[in-house]
Amino acid sequence: MATVDLRDNLLGISWVDSGWVPILNPSNVLEYFSERSNPFYDRTCNNEVVKMQRSTLDHLTQLVGVEYILLHTQEPILYIIRKQQRQSPTQVIPLADYYIIAGVVYQAPDLGSVISSRALSAVHGIQSAFDEAMSFCRYHPSKGYWWHFKDQEEKERVKPKSKRKEEPSSLFQRQRVDTLLLDLRNKFPPTFYQTKPGEKPVPVEVKKEPEVPVETVKPQEERETKPPAPPAPPRPPPQTTPNKPPPEKRARVQ
């Protein structure tokens, strides 16, 4: 298995020496940064040359090469150190920035790394959205494409089915059913069998009752809404004619 060099991925690591944290200040922060266990420090820099010559940091301007300087401080916890390439006493090229917060050293990301990380996060989110959308897509040759969401099935399962309330029957319906049952009984009367010991059962004829004309039962609403008929006018008394005797018969003269 190949090992990964930490120097190739310095943006994802940090370094701290807890022995220096209580005494850290602007005068010794560069010495703290130049510890041998610090992976961010380059030992071929001009700072090591000045340290070997036991000179001050002011002599860095007279050398050409990589150097580290204290760029900004905000005591007691924030220190910013810059790595730069010096080409002349007045011309330098920034290479990287490092910030120390409460004794922990981090490398500040460059603009290209920030843009790459943001673009990768956006593409990952878009790809996840497409994958999620495709999981709900369905296709059939006869139906085509449609969406099938799982939430709809769960809602249909959880949603209680409302039972329809049965309405009570009305008086008209009950009377109508009774009339139909009575009519069927008259059309198809039941046949009773009288059994005797040792003989076959003999059917007993049932006298069929004469059918009574069934008056149509009007709905109760019509009877309630129909106004009562006015009373009939009284009939005049019958005229009495006096009894007249029949006319006398006269003899016919020939």
Swiss-Prot record:
- Per its database record, what is this protein's job? Component of the Mediator complex, a coactivator involved in the regulated transcription of nearly all RNA polymerase II-dependent genes. Mediator functions as a bridge to convey information from gene-specific regulatory proteins to the basal RNA polymerase II transcription machinery. Mediator is recruited to promoters by direct interactions with regulatory proteins and serves as a scaffold for the assembly of a functional preinitiation complex with RNA polymerase II and the general transcription factors.
* Chief place of localization: nucleus
Question: Under the cellular component aspect of Gene Ontology, which terms does the record hold?
Answer: core mediator complex; mediator complex
List, alphabetically, the InterPro entries matched: Mediator_Med6 (IPR007018), Mediator_Med6_met/pln (IPR016820), Mediator_Med6_sf (IPR038566)
GO BP terms: regulation of transcription by RNA polymerase II
Question: How is this protein named in the record?
Answer: Mediator of RNA polymerase II transcription subunit 6
Tell me where the signal peptide lies: none
Q: Does the keyword Transcription regulation apply?
A: yes
Cell compartments where the protein resides: Nucleus
Annotated region (Disordered) at 190-254
**Segments of skewed composition (Pro residues):** 227-245
Claim: Transcription regulation is one of the keywords in the record: yes
How does this polypeptide assemble, per the annotation? Component of the Mediator complex.
Protein encoded by which gene: med6
Q: Any idea which UniProt keywords this protein has? A: Activator, Nucleus, Transcription, Transcription regulation
**A Gene Ontology molecular function term of the record:** transcription coactivator activity
Task: Spell out the family assignment given in the record's similarity comment.
Answer: Belongs to the Mediator complex subunit 6 family.
